Amino acid sequence: MMQPKRTKFRKQFKGRIHGNSKGGTDLNFGAFGLKAVEPERVTARQIEAARRAITRHMKRAGRVWIRIFPDLPVTSKPTEVRMGKGKGSVDYWACRVAPGRVMFELDGVPEDVAREALRLGAAKLPIKTRFIQRIAE
């Protein structure tokens, strides 16, 4: 699973996702993509599950680019522990995804295969998505 090699600080604030994505809204690498429609926090496990579903349907043909990275440490306290006594330890890593953000890109496969692969990948994500395609020039 993806996580940063090192960070400046071990723990971060929860934060909010305001407005639309400032960058990463266009296809830069592949011909097809999966774009977020609503704001949500996506975990490293969910990104990995989506990646596996996509590559499995493509039967290792073509290429997949993951355009999001889980750089947000999410903490949690153990069960049945009273409130207080500091912030909990890092439980998992997540990524804040704003609406309009391209999360996955594909290339080297036909459109019907790409559409189905991204549909299977989107089922693993806790977020509404849209299939996008590069306009032929």
From Swiss-Prot:
Q: Which GO terms describe its cellular component?
A: cytosolic large ribosomal subunit
What Gene3D superfamilies does the entry give?
A: Ribosomal protein L10e/L16
Q: Which domain of life is it from?
A: Bacteria
Cross-referenced InterPro entries, in alphabetical order? Ribosomal_uL16, Ribosomal_uL16_bact-type, Ribosomal_uL16_CS, Ribosomal_uL16_dom, Ribosomal_uL16_sf
The family database entries (CDD domains) matched by this protein are listed as: Ribosomal_L16_L10e (cd01433)
| Keyword annotations of the record | Ribonucleoprotein, Ribosomal protein, RNA-binding, rRNA-binding, tRNA-binding
Gene Ontology annotations of biological process type: translation
Record's PANTHER family? 50S/60S RIBOSOMAL PROTEIN L16 (PTHR12220), LARGE RIBOSOMAL SUBUNIT PROTEIN UL16M (PTHR12220:SF13)
Q: Which HAMAP family match?
A: Ribosomal_uL16 (MF_01342)
The entry assigns this protein to a family as follows:
Belongs to the universal ribosomal protein uL16 family.
Quaternary structure annotation from Swiss-Prot or TrEMBL? Part of the 50S ribosomal subunit.
Q: What is this protein called?
A: Large ribosomal subunit protein uL16
- Record the organism: Brucella anthropi (strain ATCC 49188 / DSM 6882 / CCUG 24695 / JCM 21032 / LMG 3331 / NBRC 15819 / NCTC 12168 / Alc 37) (Ochrobactrum anthropi)
Name of encoding gene: rplP
